[in-house]
Each structure stands twice: as structure tokens, then as C-alpha cells.
């Protein structure tokens, strides 16, 4: 595996490749990330991964400076997955001058849910993903369903900007107790780690209620938030939305069996966790 930090060197290395599969990451890789590499290999060759902790998507009170950086361990894991190139640019490589041009998602998709609680986050994501795709020029790119809203925004962005990249969705990888794998799980204390699976259990109960015929979605969302709050969580949102556009479904759409997803974000201690389940 070649480890490259220069954009020009990356382009030189990939010149002539027309089936490249790309997996962008921020590093601190776990089994969830590695599953993305394996899925990428099913859809293209060679597989290119990137590791870049993107300052643009962190808010002023978020964890950019303490976000775990484990490059040497990550390199070993990617080598074991037979990744062809790891693109690991420095901040100077990616942003040699202030990044004044940004890619802004529409408010109806980028300003809700995560966008409401993390203003500027999706503009940072869209900007860096567009720039990375310009560097790699892949045929396909793999994103995880764990970041459901991000997946939808990136897919829509590629459609709207006519980027010739197919976005592949990867299923969420979970620990045995159901907790979705995340680089931020390492922030949890032992007691918090024991409690953390309650988030997905809460979403499972919401899903079961909807599938069982409950149509008062607002009541379900409120009860789920209250349940987590009683257990010491600080929920930002629990929302049942249409999979197609993350808009709340109408009564007619519910009766017609509209595909739904329930999404959640909540703090447990100092750690903010997100998760979702399709319904």
C-alpha cells in the first residue's frame, strides 16, 4: 500500500484508473471502517482510502483538537485489507490557502436534525468530500448508513453537481450488545459504555411501535426522548422521517407504507452518540 499526502502525487498514481472505489475517513479506524473497505472492493478496483481530520466540519465547541489520531495503527489495518493507496494529506496539503469557496447543502436537508445542532457541519462535509473526489476521481464511493443524513446529503450532492460517482451505502456495524461502532465510543467511561446500547434499544422500540400500527409519531418521539432523559441522557432529537428526504411523513404516506427511518442523537455524559434504524 502506498501512503501519499500530495494531491499531485495521488493523481499521478491513479492516472489511467477508471474503476477506483473510494472510502473517505477521518482515521481512528475500527471494524466499521474496515467493512467499508471490503464493500468498496466489491464495487471497484483499486480501493483508495483517505484519512483527513477535516477542521471545516467541526464547530467551535467540538472536539477537533482531541479527535483521536492513530495513523500508524490505521496504516496497518488498511494494509491488511489490501487497500491500494492511502491518501493522508496534511491540512496544508488540503487547504494551502483559506478555503473561501464552500459547498452548501440546501437547508431542507442540511439544516435539519444534525444540521440544526451542528451548524456548518454539512457545509464542511460537502466541501471536503467534493475536494477529495476531485483528487481521487473515483467511480464509486462508500459511505456508512450510521451517518444516515450525511449519506443522503452526499448522494444528493453528487446528483445535483453531476459528479460521476456512484454512492454505495454500507450497513451499520455494531458491537455484540448493539452499540453502533464509532470512533467516539472510546470517550465513554465504563459505566457509560454499559448504558450506551440503550440508544439503539430505544430506537428498536420506536420501530416496533410504528410497525405495530402506532400512527402518532410525535408521541412516540416524545416518549423516546423522555425515556432516555430519565436514564441520564441528554437527547438532541429522536425523529421519525421519510427515508427519501428526511421529511416527516404525512398520515396518507404512513397508511401507504412509506419507507421510514428513525434517527437519534443524544449525549451520554460528555459523549454525543448518533444512531438510526430503518423502518
From Swiss-Prot:
It catalyses: (R)-pantoate + beta-alanine + ATP = (R)-pantothenate + AMP + diphosphate + H(+). Pathway: Cofactor biosynthesis; (R)-pantothenate biosynthesis; (R)-pantothenate from (R)-pantoate and beta-alanine: step 1/1. Pfam families: Pantoate_ligase (PF02569). Its main location: cytoplasm. The keyword Ribosomal protein does not apply. Gene3D superfamilies: HUPs, Pantoate-beta-alanine ligase, C-terminal domain. Disulfide bonds: none annotated. GO terms for molecular function: ATP binding; pantoate-beta-alanine ligase activity. ATP binds at residues 26-33, 144-147, 173, 181-184. Keywords: ATP-binding, Cytoplasm, Ligase, Nucleotide-binding, Pantothenate biosynthesis. It is found in: Cytoplasm. (R)-pantoate binds at residues 57, 150. The active site is at residue 33. Beta-alanine binds at residue 57. One of its GO terms (biological process) is pantothenate biosynthetic process. Its EC number is 6.3.2.1. The keyword Hydrolase does not apply. The reaction proceeds by a bi uni uni bi ping pong mechanism. Belongs to the pantothenate synthetase family. Catalyzes the condensation of pantoate with beta-alanine in an ATP-dependent reaction via a pantoyl-adenylate intermediate. This is Pantothenate synthetase.
Amino acid at each position: 500500500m502506498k501512503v501519499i499526502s500530495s494531491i499531485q502525487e495521488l493523481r499521478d498514481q491513479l492516472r489511467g484508473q477508471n474503476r477506483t472505489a473510494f472510502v473517505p475517513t477521518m482515521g481512528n479506524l475500527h471494524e466499521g471502517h474496515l467493512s467499508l473497505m471490503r464493500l468498496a472492493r466489491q464495487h471497484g478496483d483499486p480501493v483508495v482510502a483517505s484519512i483527513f481530520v477535516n477542521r471545516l466540519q467541526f464547530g467551535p465547541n467540538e472536539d477537533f483538537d482531541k479527535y483521536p489520531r492513530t495513523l500508524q495503527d490505521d496504516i496497518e489495518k488498511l494494509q491488511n485489507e489490501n487497500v491500494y493507496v492511502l491518501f493522508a494529506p496534511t491540512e496544508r496539503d488540503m487547504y494551502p490557502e483559506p478555503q473561501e469557496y464552500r459547498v452548501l447543502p440546501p437547508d431542507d436537508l442540511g439544516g435539519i436534525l444534525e444540521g440544526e445542532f451542528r451548524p456548518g457541519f454539512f457545509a464542511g462535509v460537502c466541501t471536503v468530500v467534493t475536494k477529495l473526489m476531485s483528487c481521487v476521481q473515483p467511480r464509486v464511493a462508500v459511505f456508512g448508513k450510521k451517518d444516515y443524513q450525511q449519506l443522503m446529503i452526499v448522494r444528493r450532492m453528487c446528483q445535483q453537481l453531476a459528479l460521476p460517482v456512484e454512492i454505495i451505502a454500507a450497513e451499520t456495524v455494531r458491537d455484540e450488545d448493539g452499540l453502533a461502532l464509532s470512533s467516539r465510543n472510546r470517550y465513554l467511561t465504563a459505566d457509560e459504555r454499559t448504558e450506551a446500547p440503550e440508544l439503539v434499544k430505544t430506537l428498536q422500540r420506536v420501530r416496533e411501535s410504528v410497525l405495530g400500527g402506532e400512527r402518532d409519531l410525535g408521541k412516540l418521539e416524545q416518549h423516546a426522548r423522555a425515556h432516555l432523559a430519565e436514564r441520564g441522557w441528554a437527547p438532541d432529537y429522536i425523529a421519525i422521517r421519510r427515508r427519501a428526504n428526511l421529511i416527516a411523513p404525512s398520515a396518507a404516506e404512513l397508511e401507504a407504507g412509506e419507507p421510514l427511518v428513525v434517527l437519534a442523537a443524544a449525549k451520554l455524559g460528555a459523549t454525543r452518540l448518533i444512531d438510526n434504524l430503518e423502518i
